[in-house]
Amino acid sequence: MFENIESFLSNNNELAWIAIFMFAFMESFILSGIIVSSAILFSVCIFVFNMELLPLYTIVMVAMLGAHLGDVSGFFFGKTVGPTLLATKFISKREKTIKRAQKFLDKTGQYTVILGRFVPAIRPIVPFLLGISDLKAVRFYIADVVACTCWGIALTLLVTGVGSLIG
């Protein structure tokens, strides 16, 4: 699969930033993030950096923007479908567990955003769950900007570190 992406980007250099944005968004959003691996995003970023298709700061900024918009979209998706989801028979049977989880998220919501950004398995799920919880959008937004900034720094280190090993 990555060979196809690599070939596409080699033939369409001007679309490299769109590919980075798209993969960053998809790996962060609840509906696609469960399927799209962050390894694809990292591989695309490393390829674009090694082929010098974009400067490093552009790669990182576009990836951060895509990730942030994916997180915010997941948060508001949770706000939108959360009440309906919580009213389902399946969820209502687990009311005690749901209340405990909501209490935990209400206490630790902002920290959960930052932690979730660095754990690929839960990355797309955390914003959605926080959208269902009572966390205010402004608190989520600020925490997510901090999380995506820290993640962008880590992405810079990953891209340059792996890039120097390969190239």
Set out the residue ranges of the language-model regions.
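Membrane-interfacial helix-loop-helix
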Residues: 1-22, 51-128, 132-144, 157-167
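Transmembrane alpha-helix interface/packing and boundary motifs in multi-pass membrane proteins
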Residues: 21-41, 115-116
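Short helix-loop boundary/capping segments at the starts of domains
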Residues: 31, 50-51
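Re-entrant/interfacial helical elements at transmembrane boundaries that shape
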Residues: 33-47, 125-133
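Central hydrophobic cores of alpha-helical transmembrane segments
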Residues: 38, 144-146
